[in-house]
A protein has these predicted regions:
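Conserved G/P- and acidic residue-centered "switch" motifs that form tight phosphate/ATP-binding loops
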Residues: 16-17, 55, 81, 169
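Short, low-complexity, intrinsically disordered N-terminal peptides in bacterial proteins
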Residues: 1-9, 190-197
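Flexible, glycine-rich phosphate/dinucleotide-binding loops
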Residues: 21, 57, 121
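Acidic/histidine-rich helix-loop elements
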Residues: 24, 49-57, 86-89, 165
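Serine-esterase "nucleophile elbow" of acetyl-processing enzymes
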Residues: 2-54, 64-73
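Alpha-helical cap/lid subdomain in secreted, periplasmic
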Residues: 40, 44, 60-197
Length: 197
């Protein structure tokens, strides 16, 4: 076998909203390029497709799932729900959409990392519990990897957040990538076992 046809890079799709898309940041400073660079620095060859669309809800992500995650995809990072929460959408609707996303990806034997989100305190304890409980429940249901809070390390820190108080700045993205990196490596290991060469 010629050396040129050595193991191809794993293909990941990052399915999300503006937090995945890199809202308000230069092209190379968003989550996807920074994550790909961090993996490359560790000697891990991977191609990450940025399927982040600003403003998308979980239902929007479901509606475009099939064309956002093409054949040959090894793994998907699912980061959806923040816009549902900000709009006060019924957590049941968010859960139903995320459930359908995970079900379809599982049926396709694609490894999944589900990223959780936290509800704003002003939505109340009942909403917060219902919303935040969606993620661990579905991760367990489908055997997906689970990262409890996508914005871990940057949320609430003004020095790591853009002026809107919601989206991470470049430094914030660096923190997010650093914290989620071990879980993404675990995802790639799982993807390799689901797609034996």
């Amino acid at each position: 076998m010629p050396a040129a046809s050595a193991e191809a890079p794993s293909k990941i799709v990052a399915l999300g909203d503006s937090l995945t898309a890199g809202f308000g940041l230069p092209d190379q400073e968003g989550f996807v390029p920074r994550l790909q660079a961090a993996l490359a620095d560790g000697g891990i060859a991977v191609e990450i497709a940025n399927a982040g669309v600003s403003g998308d809800t979980a239902a929007d992500g479901l509606a475009r799932l099939d064309w956002s995650v093409p054949p040959g995809t090894d793994a998907v990072i699912v980061e959806l729900g923040a816009n549902d929460m900000l709009r006060g959408i019924d957590p049941k609707a968010t859960r139903d959409a995320l459930d359908a996303i995970l079900r379809r990806l599982t049926q396709r034997h694609i490894a999944v990392l589900l990223c959780g989100m936290r509800a704003a305190p002003n939505l109340g304890a009942e909403y917060g519990q219902a919303f935040e409980g969606i993620y661990p429940e579905l991760a367990e249901k489908y055997g997906a990897l689970f990262y409890p809070f996508f914005l871990d390390g940057s949320a609430g820190d003004r020095s790591l957040t853009q002026h809107d108080g919601l989206h991470p700045n470049a430094a914030g993205v660096g923190v997010i990538v650093g914290r989620i990196l071990p879980k993404v490596k675990e995802l790639l290991t799982r993807a390799g076992s689901q797609h034996p060469s």
